[in-house]
Curated annotation (Swiss-Prot):
Protein name: Large ribosomal subunit protein uL5
Any Pfam family hit: Ribosomal_L5
Recorded family membership: Belongs to the universal ribosomal protein uL5 family.
Protein function: This is one of the proteins that bind and probably mediate the attachment of the 5S RNA into the large ribosomal subunit, where it forms part of the central protuberance. In the 70S ribosome it contacts protein S13 of the 30S subunit (bridge B1b), connecting the 2 subunits; this bridge is implicated in subunit movement. Contacts the P site tRNA; the 5S rRNA and some of its associated proteins might help stabilize positioning of ribosome-bound tRNAs.
Organism from which the protein derives: Ruegeria pomeroyi (strain ATCC 700808 / DSM 15171 / DSS-3)
Keywords: Ribonucleoprotein, Ribosomal protein, RNA-binding, rRNA-binding, tRNA-binding
GO molecular function: rRNA binding; structural constituent of ribosome; tRNA binding
Entries under HAMAP family matching the protein: Ribosomal_uL5_B
Subunit text: Part of the 50S ribosomal subunit; part of the 5S rRNA/L5/L18/L25 subcomplex. Contacts the 5S rRNA and the P site tRNA. Forms a bridge to the 30S subunit in the 70S ribosome.
Keyword tRNA-binding listed: yes
GO cellular component: ribonucleoprotein complex; ribosome
Gene: rplE
A GO BP annotation: translation
Cited InterPro entries: Ribosomal_uL5, Ribosomal_uL5_bac-type, Ribosomal_uL5_C, Ribosomal_uL5_CS, Ribosomal_uL5_dom_sf, Ribosomal_uL5_N
Length: 186
C-alpha cells in the first residue's frame, strides 16, 4: 500500500535521480540552479461556436477538464463582444487549469504513457517551442484520457497543452522533455 506522506510521482523521482545529472553533463552547467526543470503545465479547452449556442457546453468542458487534471478547472469567458459571432462579453467560452508540483508530474506521466499511445494515427508530437523553452501541443480528442468515460461524453473537445520550463533555449527544453520520454517526431 502506498504511504501518502512518502509518495513521490514517478517522473519527479526520475528527474531528481537521473535527468538532472544527464542535463548537467549534456549542457555543461556549472551550477545546479541552471539545470532546466518543469515549471507548470496549462491545459485549455475552447468550446468556440458550441458555447455560443448552448451555455452548458462550457460547463461540460470544465467538468471534463477537472477530471483529466485532478483539480478544479476555471471557466474562461469572452473578453469582448463580437456581434458577427453572436458572442457577448463575459460569455463562458471554455475552461482552463494550471498544474504545478506533484499533479504536474502525474499529468505528464499519464499524458506520455497512457493518453498519447491512444491517439489515432499517432506518429509523435511536432517539436513546437516558443523560443524561450516552452512547449505547446494540441490534442484533437480529449477522450484519449482514461478519466473520461466515452459513453457519458456529450461533446468531443480539442485540447491545448502548454508545458512551461525554466530552460533558456528550445534545445534545452527539448532535451529535458526527451529525457521524460516525450515522443518527438523530428
Amino acid at each position: 500500500m502506498l504511504d501518502a506522506a512518502n509518495y513521490t510521482p514517478r517522473l519527479k523521482a526520475q528527474y531528481a535521480e537521473t535527468i538532472r545529472a544527464a542535463l548537467k553533463e549534456e549542457f555543461g552547467y556549472k551550477n545546479d540552479m541552471m539545470i532546466p526543470k518543469l515549471e507548470k503545465i496549462v491545459l485549455n479547452i475552447g468550446c468556440g461556436a458550441e458555447a455560443v449556442k448552448d451555455s452548458k457546453k462550457a460547463k461540460s468542458a470544465q467538468e471534463d477538464l477537472s477530471k483529466i487534471a485532478g483539480q478544479k478547472a476555471i471557466t474562461t469567458t469572452a473578453k469582448k463582444s463580437i456581434a458577427g459571432f453572436r458572442v457577448r462579453e463575459d460569455m463562458p467560452m471554455g475552461a482552463k487549469v494550471t498544474l504545478r508540483g506533484e499533479r504536474m508530474y502525474e499529468f505528464l506521466d499519464r499524458l506520455i504513457t497512457i493518453a498519447m499511445p491512444r491517439i489515432r494515427d499517432f506518429r509523435g508530437v511536432k517539436p513546437s517551442f516558443d523560443g524561450r523553452g516552452n512547449f505547446a501541443m494540441g490534442i484533437k480528442e480529449h477522450i484519449v484520457f482514461p478519466e473520461i468515460d466515452f459513453d457519458k461524453v456529450d461533446e468531443v473537445w480539442g485540447m491545448d497543452i502548454v508545458i512551461a520550463t525554466t530552460a533558456k533555449t528550445d534545445a534545452e527544453a527539448k532535451s529535458l522533455l526527451k529525457h521524460f520520454n516525450m515522443p518527438f517526431n523530428a
